[in-house]
């Protein structure tokens, strides 16, 4: 395919275009402390990694089928596993809402310049992701997305 035939460039969201700021363990620590958690960042990171991997395995076994309901359930399970001692629906909601806020994210340093150059060359730019519906509000609040 010739470059002149390319009309759009599609970017993945998390890990390619944007990332949580502060990182997930730090955000989880702040939220967890509000509910009495005394976990260290290392403990949170370890528990998160294990819980996330378990959910990834479940999704892989199901053929990667997802939905808004499944995404909410998977994240609620992850939060519950990380904060087993203090887990509550309110803690989950706090974190769910936190990661829907553009202020909890930042674009990588090279994104704005890259997107500007591509737009100047006439390409349409898109973000495609398996992130749930919260991504739309995050992108709306993060220039240049």
Q: Which residues are covered by each model-predicted region?
A:
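Substrate-recognition "cap/lid" segment bordering the active-site pocket of phosphatases
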Residues: 105-106, 126-128, 132-145
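Catalytic-core regions built around general acid/base machinery
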Residues: 110-123
